[in-house]
């Protein structure tokens, strides 16, 4: 695969992810970063951001002018962002339930630190699916500690045709599960390669022409640096996400059990706001719209 970005132009902590913050909680699966307020007064209710497990947290803090963290801080919000641990084959057993339990601990930590009775959450991609499942679990327990949830490019209802689904059948999904079972993890670069082939003109041949035919350096583009700075998924979570895609259980009340409770998304009382990208080839806006419904 041709390089999409000049990696020498970026470094986390130098020109990426530079908003001041500290790790205030840690468990086996995640670190919780609390960012320093930029206003004299802050809102009581904090916001907790849940990134996708296959990518790194600093997509929400790329640069001062492209930083959700800085925007929320300047808006007077107490801001926390999760950084997921990069698993190895020793953590192959980590599944959706384990990630939700870890997220529950992070929620408890945020509430304990801020003294707030509840919080708002923002989840992106698989992080949004994880956050939604947690809210379903809370709803089953009668727990209202999440006031509002924002979902960014998160698919809860997989009953929609996408470019990705055109290449996927049971045989392909079973083969993917076998591969991650053997390795213990799914390498992020393998998943990125699959997604790139969904838009080959933009994400492959464009760079082939630029890098090899024209002899130019790859461009300096912060979001592409982040997109290429992948992590791994443990086999357990990979298998669960495949079955969510295949069986679409979140659509049917009680079809999915999380942490010992059946999930019914209709019982969630938190306000939910869904965001989609009009040109997103991985999570088309129609899929996010179905989730909102």
Description of each model-found segment:
Residues 91-114:
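Alpha/beta-hydrolase active-site loop
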Residues 227-263, 270:
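Mobile cap/lid helix-loop segments that gate and shape the active-site cleft of serine hydrolases
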Residues 107-127:
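Alpha/beta-hydrolase fold nucleophile elbow
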Residues 1-88:
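Short, surface-exposed "cap/lid" segments of acyl-processing enzymes
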């Amino acid at each position: 695969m041709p390089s999409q970005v000049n990696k020498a132009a970026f470094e986390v902590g130098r020109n990426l992810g530079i908003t001041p913050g500290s790790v205030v909680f840690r468990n086996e699966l995640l670190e919780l970063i609390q960012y320093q307020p930029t206003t004299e007064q802050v809102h009581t209710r904090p916001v907790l951001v849940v990134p996708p497990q296959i990518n790194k947290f600093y997509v929400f803090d790329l640069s001062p002018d492209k930083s959700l963290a800085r925007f929320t801080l300047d808006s007077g919000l107490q801001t926390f962002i999760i950084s997921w641990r990069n698993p190895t084959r020793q953590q192959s057993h980590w599944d959706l339930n384990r990630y939700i339990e870890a997220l529950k601990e992070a929620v408890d930590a945020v509430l304990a630190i801020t003294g707030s009775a509840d919080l708002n959450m923002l989840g992106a991609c698989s992080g949004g699916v994880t956050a939604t499942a947690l809210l379903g679990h809370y709803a089953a327990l009668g727990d209202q500690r999440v006031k509002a949830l924002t979902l960014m490019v998160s698919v809860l209802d997989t009953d929609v045709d996408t470019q990705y689904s055109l290449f996927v059948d049971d045989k392909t999904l079973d083969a993917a599960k076998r591969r991650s079972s053997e390795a213990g993890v799914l390498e992020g670069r393998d998943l990125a390669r699959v997604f790139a082939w969904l838009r080959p003109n933009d994400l492959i041949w464009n760079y082939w022409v630029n890098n090899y035919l024209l002899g130019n350096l790859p461009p300096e583009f912060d979001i592409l640096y982040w997109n290429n700075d992948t992590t791994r998924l443990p086999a357990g979570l990979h298998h669960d996400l495949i079955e969510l895609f295949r069986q679409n259980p979140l659509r049917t009340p009680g079809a999915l059990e999380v942490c010992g409770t059946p999930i019914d998304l209709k019982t969630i009382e938190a306000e939910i706001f869904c965001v989609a990208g009009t040109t997103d080839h991985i999570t088309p806006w129609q899929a996010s719209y179905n989730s909102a419904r």
